[in-house]
A protein has these predicted regions:
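Short coil/turn linker and secondary-structure boundary residues
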Residues: 1, 32, 46, 83-86, ...
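Acidic/histidine-rich alpha-helical segments that form the ligand environment
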Residues: 82-119, 126-140, 144
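Short, charged, low-complexity loops and linkers
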Residues: 1-16, 81-84, 90
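Short, contiguous alpha-helical
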Residues: 11, 15-19, 23-29, 34-78, ...
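Serine/threonine-rich low-complexity intrinsically disordered regions
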Residues: 2, 72, 87-89, 115-116, ...
C-alpha cells in the first residue's frame, strides 16, 4: 500500500464512521419532538439540540477548516448557550451539511494533509490527529444522543438494529425465520 492509498483509506474510514454516526442521530431525531430535542435533564446539562450544534462546530473546525483549510469562524460558547427551539429538521440539515463538507475533505485528503502540523483550537496537531480527535468525538456525542433519547422514550424507543441470527447474537427465542 502506498502512502497515498493509506491516506485515501484513512479518509474513507473516517467518512464511513461519520455516516454511521449521522444515521444514528437521524434515527433518534425521528423519534423525538422539537421539545424533546431541546429538553435538558438539569439546568447545567446540554440538550440534544446543543449537542448537535456542538458537533457541527467541532467537525467544521477540526476537519473542514483544520484539515481542509476552510476559514474557521466557530463560536463554541454559542453552541451550548442556545436554548432553541431551532426545529429538529433544521438541526439535521445543518449537521448533514457539515458532514458532507467533512466527507469532501476526507475524500481528497493526501499524505501532506495528514502529516502536516497545524493549530486547531489552540492545539498543534497533525491532520491525522485532527481526524482521529474529531471523528471519535462525533461518535461519542452520538452515543450520548442515543442514551438521552432512550432516557426520554423508555420502552417506546425503537432500536435501529437488532440481532436476527445466532451469528449476530440473537437469543434463540428471538431469531427470525430465514426460510
Amino acid at each position: 500500500m502506498t502512502a497515498d492509498e493509506l491516506a485515501a483509506a484513512v479518509g474513507a474510514a473516517a467518512a464511513h464512521e461519520l455516516d454511521s454516526a449521522l444515521d444514528r442521530i437521524k434515527h433518534c431525531q425521528g423519534q423525538l419532538t422539537d421539545e424533546q430535542v431541546w429538553r435538558r435533564s438539569a439546568p447545567g446539562l446540554n440538550s440534544i439540540g446543543n449537542l448537535i450544534l456542538h458537533l457541527c462546530g467541532n467537525l467544521r473546525q477540526w476537519v473542514v477548516a483544520g484539515v481542509g483549510g476552510a476559514p474557521d469562524a466557530r463560536n463554541r460558547p454559542a453552541e451550548f448557550a442556545e436554548r432553541g427551539p431551532i426545529p429538529k429538521e433544521e438541526l439535521l440539515r445543518r449537521l448533514e451539511a457539515v458532514v458532507e463538507q467533512a466527507k469532501g475533505v476526507l475524500a481528497g485528503v493526501d499524505t501532506r494533509q495528514l502529516t502536516e502540523v497545524r493549530r486547531i483550537q489552540g492545539f498543534d496537531v497533525t491532520g491525522v490527529a485532527a481526524i482521529f480527535d474529531s471523528v471519535p468525538h462525533f461518535r461519542g456525542h452520538t452515543q450520548e444522543i442515543v442514551h438521552m433519547t432512550r432516557l426520554q422514550l423508555g420502552d417506546a424507543y425503537h432500536f435501529a438494529w437488532a440481532p436476527a441470527t445466532p451469528e449476530q447474537g440473537a437469543p434463540a427465542d428471538k431469531q427470525r425465520d430465514e426460510g
